[in-house]
Amino acid sequence: KSIKRRDKWRFLRIGARWDRSVVPIYEAAARGKCVPLLKTLLTSHCRNECAYCAFRASRKCPRMTWEPRKLAEITKRLWEERKIMGLFLSSSVFKDSDFVTERQLETVRALRNMGYTGYIHLRLMPDVNRHYFREAIELADRVGVNLEAPNKEVFSELCPDKGGFEESVRKRLEWVVDEVRKTKTETTKPKFGFAGAGVDTQMIVGAAEDNDWQHIQTTEWLYKKLGLKRV
């Protein structure tokens, strides 16, 4: 059955709210300015049971997916019409993390090949293979991996089947930071991409037996040790 595009936006933007927004085009704060971004999930099909998520696997709800090429075309058109300045692309985990990441990269690769030089914020998946990070960093202006929690105990409560906190998310975030640092030594880079806007992450606050001090400690480590731009 054919699904109208506006209905697809309506459902995919629900999932995108877990990345700080409830609408597909929203005003992001950047260096004292408001930047309109197109924000969406690539798919709402998910295999995981994260306690806070509207699209957890066991929940009965409509499931939608964008084809990478189509999403790239829509983004390019909105950018040319000056309705947006960038794309924030995240996703639920369908099949496995590598599969989803390949589809994300297919989307942003197509967008860059269309001549798009606007902002791209790419949210990478937990457990994803490190060899995807280099291309993601080259294509996107900001990249990140969601920690979801300040420590492994809270993570296990929130994300019981998402892998281990240290291995699946924290190590991936450290890998991203390491790969971004490697690109800083390169002298010939375009004016877009190459994670020029840095690395970010997010944590869910108050959905488990967490406390403010845990989040403060972890946030301090993220900013001072890893050098993240936003938590």
Write out the residue ranges for each language-model feature:
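Flexible, acidic/Gly-rich N-terminal and inter-domain linker regions that tether
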Residues: 1-48
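Conserved, mostly hydrophobic/aromatic
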Residues: 37, 50, 89, 145, ...
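Canonical Radical SAM [4Fe-4S] cluster-binding loop centered on the CxxxCxxC motif
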Residues: 40-69
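Residues forming anionic-ligand binding surfaces in small-molecule and nucleic-acid pockets
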Residues: 48-52, 83, 148
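Hydrophobic residues within beta-strands of alpha/beta enzymes
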Residues: 53, 86-89, 143-145, 231
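Short acidic, glycine/Ser/Thr-rich loop/turn "cap" segments at secondary-structure junctions
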Residues: 55-61, 87-97, 120
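Conserved AdoMet/S-adenosylmethionine-binding subsite of the radical SAM
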Residues: 72, 95-231
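Short Fe-S-cluster ligation motifs
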Residues: 74-92
